[in-house]
Amino acid sequence: MTPSRLAFTACSPEPELHLFEAEPTSTKIVFAELELDAYWDYEVEVGVRYEWRTEWYYGWDAEDYRIWGEIGYVIPNTFNIRRYFTGSTPYAHHTKVISNTIEGNTFQGEFNYGFWDMLVFNDIKLKDGVQSLNFDETTTLDSITVYTNQSMAKARYNAPRYSHAFYEPEELFSAYEQAIEIDREHKGFEYDPERNLWVKRLNMVLQPITYIYLTQVIVHHNNGKIVGVEGTGTLSGFARSSVLNSGRGGEDPVSVTYQTRWKKDCDMNGEKVDIAGGRLLNFGLCGHACGRLHSKQEVHDTEKHYMDVKLLFNNGIDSTFVFDVTQQVRDRYKGGVLTVELDMDTISVPSRSGGSGFDAVVKEFEEETHEIEM
């Protein structure tokens, strides 16, 4: 996705700035030019942009919107601001925080002369009234760590420290600027004669902290063998947490649980196929600030990424299929479409619950499920 910019404008009346060390006065901060690309926009190869629409066959209808909301990112309009005054020393440790929340694009606050650090992140809009994101602002004032907790869903793969999969986070974006100087000589300010104000502009890049993945298991030649999905899936090997200031994902790999839905007779280049589709958010790759990367050559991911989906067959038996999507995830390091395809002419209907019944697997992953390398 294309980075969005938060243009802060610090305003004060002419001829004096009216900021005092002992008695700070109000200064207006204005957000401008806030635009957020709805989908992914980055290079998958040198000079090659990612075209997700050419890969996505599941579609997006009214029921999908009811379950997940928009298919892509939604522009936030409410922001949390954390301001840290570091006195005469830029890039110093934070000893105190000033917190504010704003609606719209204007903030009225007070600033002392000296250096400031500023962190901005969107307020969370909930569909069901339950927030998954947790914000740790007390362990250290130098950064804010965000994370989710474990769900009731089992984590079967590549989550060595945790027995359960984690809830997916909500959409989250942040921008962080350090060593913002408020100077009594107006250094770094510009004068606006129309408004009779001194203006200091801070172009802060709004980057995603959570990343959207669209998953689709495309079933060819189904002929009624698979009749639906259990309704949930998991995707493994992603960061458990992230740091708002840097955008860097934590080092602990976890599985993330998400909803899935079954659709019949989807069009795939003229062929009618059935698809188990889903949408999930996560904190990206462990140890990476994915939103700040520019090419997949910068990705040094060492985790394996498995996607599992429980499919329901026409004889009443369910079967969990596990797909190795590691390379797809590394290629789509900022999110995107993950696709696997099954040809039901080569897959037998299972005779016992839990078993995939897939007789063309690379290797058996565990007794009830199989790993399928794509």
Ranges and model annotations:
Residues M1-S12:
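Sec-dependent bacterial lipoprotein signal peptides
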Residues C11-I144, R330-M374:
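Acidic/polar, low-complexity intrinsically disordered N-terminal segments immediately downstream
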Residues R66-Q131, I226-R330:
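Tryptophan-paired
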